[in-house]
Amino acid sequence: MKKLSFQQIILTLQNYWQDYGCAILQPYDAYVGAGTFHPATVLRCLGTKPWSVAYVQPSRRPGDSRYGMHPNRMQHYYQFQVILKPSPDNIQELYLKSLECLGIDLKIHDIRFVEDDWESPTLGAAGLGWEVWCNGMEVSQFTYMQQIGGIECRPVAGEITYGLERLALYIQGVDEVRELDWNGQVGEKALKYGEVDFEAEWQFSKYNLELADSEMLLRHFKDSEDQCERLIKANLPMPAYDECLKASHAFNQLNALGVISVTERASYVLRVRHLARICCTKWLEMNK
């Protein structure tokens, strides 16, 4: 099996899906918990217009802060997201061919689709789904997106989310993310993942778990909530969705700090879901 560098894995996936016909988009410039939160998925999966895109999305999950000490769990990581709308009949075959392009021999390695229906409570999104395991390790999530913002997706979109770090761990045969070959160079030009990201991982973990100001975050949540509602009334669903993302991230930070109770957590989830719903509803009204 070819031992592609981390950036070669990304480039290979971009080239593969570009050749299929996907537009290669850029990461969204906001804090998101997963590639699904990019408006290219949340908003564009709604409505009837065909939409085929692929993109890398840096993602943040404050609750996964481990000061860079966990072998494969981090508060900041990368996903490669593919959206095919409508979902083609051969989407599973397309996915498997993408693995072959990464040097994974399907005749040798055990690839399994393990049923795992997907749901995002804050987005009001759900779909039939499968985890994809390679020799017992999850490397991707495969979902037929059926609902976003509480609105049915017609037609259903196919979503493929590659966990780039886990995929790279398997392809390169290493045990810790920090040891991943980032750029495929040797000597002075060689870079490991840890050299690129792990100082930030430690610093943001300390911030997320110890130093974030909960009172400030509560104010930010309420401010973003109010601003989202105001922008929807002004028929501006895209900047409104940005405010929804800000509220969602503030909630995730509060959750990581452990300052909200179980009951409060459920209330915050419903508030973020409401924001996502009104953004999706307004966007669909304006883009039928």
Swiss-Prot record:
Could you tell me one molecular function GO term of this UniProt entry?
A: glycine-tRNA ligase activity
Q: Report whether Transferase shows up as a keyword of the record.
A: no
The domain of life for this entry's organism is: Bacteria
Coiled-coil region(s) at which residues?
none
Name the major location.
Answer: cytoplasm
Q: Which InterPro entries match?
A: aa-tRNA-synth_II/BPL/LPL (IPR045864), Gly-tRNA-synth_heterodimer (IPR006194), Gly-tRNA_ligase_asu (IPR002310)
Instruction: List the catalytic activities from the record.
Output: tRNA(Gly) + glycine + ATP = glycyl-tRNA(Gly) + AMP + diphosphate
Q: Which EC main class describes this enzyme?
A: ligase
UniProt keyword annotations, A-Z: Aminoacyl-tRNA synthetase, ATP-binding, Cytoplasm, Ligase, Nucleotide-binding, Protein biosynthesis
Q: Pfam families given for it?
A: tRNA-synt_2e (PF02091)
**For this UniProt entry, what's an example GO CC term?**
cytosol
Asked whether the keyword Cell inner membrane is assigned, the reply is: no
Where does this protein reside within or beyond the cell?
A: Cytoplasm
Name the Enzyme Commission number(s) assigned to this protein. Answer: 6.1.1.14
Q: Name one GO biological process term.
A: glycyl-tRNA aminoacylation
Family statement drawn from the similarity comment of this UniProt entry: Belongs to the class-II aminoacyl-tRNA synthetase family.
Q: How does the annotation summarize its subunit structure?
A: Tetramer of two alpha and two beta subunits.
Spell out the protein name for this chain: Glycine--tRNA ligase alpha subunit
> What gene makes this protein?
glyQ
